[in-house]
């Protein structure tokens, strides 16, 4: 199973929290101390908590569960998309639209519209329109792709959320809580851990740290899915030749 060591975390800067004046007292159990007015996260807490979260993600993968990766700030955006694609999962990396989970019926209509426009752009429909109308539809399609492209093939609500920066993505976490969807989240010293089922206390700004969380999560999901495939193959009597 994919596990992350303290050495990996130190190298990525996972232990550097925010400035002490911005702290959230609810994060006190996960803070080791402060250095130069910056909180230091206790990695002796983070390592087992993160590895427990990864073990749970392996189980989600085994059940072919759908995981929605959420990270809309600049430091996380690209890495979130890459991790979701690498693990055949889904993502929101531009802006969280209120109601993305709690008002999924409306979101489904927008996804339907996006798919219609995608077909029109390739089947010659756009060519039959006036230049202005074609441009308007292209812009509409691009706008929808930007906000919904990562979930257009999700086909329903996710089984779990994996969030980078609990503070920044508090609306997504609240929606998941309302629907009983488990939340895995990186929670920095300035964030509120309430509503997070699997807390990963750590730096949520350093790109190397963000990539560490996401790569490990993607690997765990893929491992779980492959386990399931291997089990089915064994059951059916398919054994790969050496």
Curated annotation (Swiss-Prot):
InterPro entries: Ribosomal_uS2, Ribosomal_uS2_bac/mit/plastid, Ribosomal_uS2_CS, Ribosomal_uS2_flav_dom_sf
GO cellular component term of the entry, any: cytosolic small ribosomal subunit
Alphabetically ordered keywords of this record: Ribonucleoprotein, Ribosomal protein
Taxonomic path: Bacteria, Pseudomonadati, Pseudomonadota, Gammaproteobacteria, Vibrionales
Similarity field: Belongs to the universal ribosomal protein uS2 family.
Tagged with keyword Ion transport: no
BP term (GO), one: translation
Statement: the UniProt record of this protein carries the keyword ATP-binding: no
GO-annotated molecular function: structural constituent of ribosome
Species annotation: Vibrio vulnificus (strain YJ016)
Protein's name in the database: Small ribosomal subunit protein uS2
